[in-house]
């Protein structure tokens, strides 16, 4: 009986370790973030009109879903890629000011970080340095979108 309990304990610890490693892999620090002129409010939050990569899977989601969060393209160093990232949410923090915003991944990019909608970029750029430099340095973590 004791052997069975030890086995169960080992399995439980292994599962917890794997889950913690997965959670750690779902965030990144000191990531370069640029901006993109999606301006979804001007195109009725239409992913097809924005030519967003995720339109194939998410364009027919309800309007409330598409406008709940600001948009971003994702090509960060940690987290799922391609279709697996579509519709997921990130909490993005400007490392210079601590300002945070939650965004929804609607597109992919190639800059190795994030390409935030200009509205979100401006919301995070509270000291104006991002605009001056053409990019922000941010941390991000995948979060529940609560949809």
UniProtKB/Swiss-Prot annotation:
Induction: By TMV infection. Residues 26-147 form the Barwin domain. GO terms for molecular function: RNA nuclease activity. Gene3D superfamilies: RlpA-like domain. Residues 1-25 form the signal peptide. The keyword Secreted applies. This is Pathogenesis-related protein PR-4B. It comes from Nicotiana tabacum.
């Amino acid at each position: 009986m004791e052997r069975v309990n030890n086995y169960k304990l080992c399995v439980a610890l292994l599962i917890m370790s794997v889950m913690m490693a997965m959670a750690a892999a779902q965030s990144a620090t000191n990531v370069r973030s640029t901006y993109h002129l999606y301006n979804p409010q001007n195109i009725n939050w239409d992913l097809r009109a924005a030519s967003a990569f995720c339109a194939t899977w998410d364009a027919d989601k309800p309007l409330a879903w598409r406008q709940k969060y600001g948009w971003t393209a994702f090509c960060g160093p940690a987290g799922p890629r391609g279709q697996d990232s579509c519709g997921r949410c990130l909490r993005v923090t400007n490392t210079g000011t601590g300002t945070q915003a939650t965004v929804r991944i609607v597109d992919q990019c190639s800059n190795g970080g994030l390409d935030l909608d200009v509205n979100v970029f401006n919301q995070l750029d509270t000291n104006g340095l991002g605009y001056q430099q053409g990019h922000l340095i941010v941390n991000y973590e995948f979060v529940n979108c609560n949809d």
